[in-house]
């Protein structure tokens, strides 16, 4: 998990289709750091490249890479139980990741076995969306504490703003 350079976020409820953009902004802006709280260069990987999308639309774009590719990644699958078909589809995809198909005789059809984190919402309400946002914000800040970085400054972003002002 800690060595993975990317984090895949796939949601299986169309109403959450933009959640990956929120997660990208929160995590990458907060934890994209190379200097720790003691002003020392870190000697380990911090942050992660966040990517993903809406599951039913994503299956033919990047799921091949997930199942048979060579890159390791953290995988999060999010769905509400209220969307029954998509919930079953998500469950099947996670099951396929965990169990694989090592008994397949044709080696080129075999898939990698890997884990995934399933975030299951009872329904999609303002309360449950708030819980999901809070979960992601807490995950982000705890990673920052673990890496000893400051999640609340974004000097890389600020430099771009300063240089834009100079151009005006």
Language model segments and positions:
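A SIS-like phosphosugar-recognition module
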Residues: 1-168
């Amino acid at each position: 998990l800690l060595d993975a350079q990317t984090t895949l976020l796939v949601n299986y409820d169309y109403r959450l289709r933009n959640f990956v953009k929120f997660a990208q902004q929160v995590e990458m802006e907060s934890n994209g750091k190379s200097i720790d709280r003691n002003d020392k260069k870190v000697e380990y990987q911090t942050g992660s490249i966040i990517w993903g999308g809406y599951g039913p639309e994503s299956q033919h774009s990047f799921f091949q890479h997930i199942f048979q590719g060579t890159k390791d990644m953290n995988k999060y699958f999010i769905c509400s139980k209220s969307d029954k078909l998509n919930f079953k589809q998500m469950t099947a995809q996670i099951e396929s990741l965990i169990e694989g198909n090592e008994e397949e005789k044709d080696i080129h059809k075999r898939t990698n076995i890997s884990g995934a984190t399933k975030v299951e919402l009872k329904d999609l309400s303002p309360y449950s969306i708030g819980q999901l946002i809070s979960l992601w914000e807490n995950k982000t800040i705890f990673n920052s504490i673990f890496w000893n970085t400051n999640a609340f400054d974004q000097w890389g972003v600020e430099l771009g703003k300063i240089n834009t002002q100079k151009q005006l």
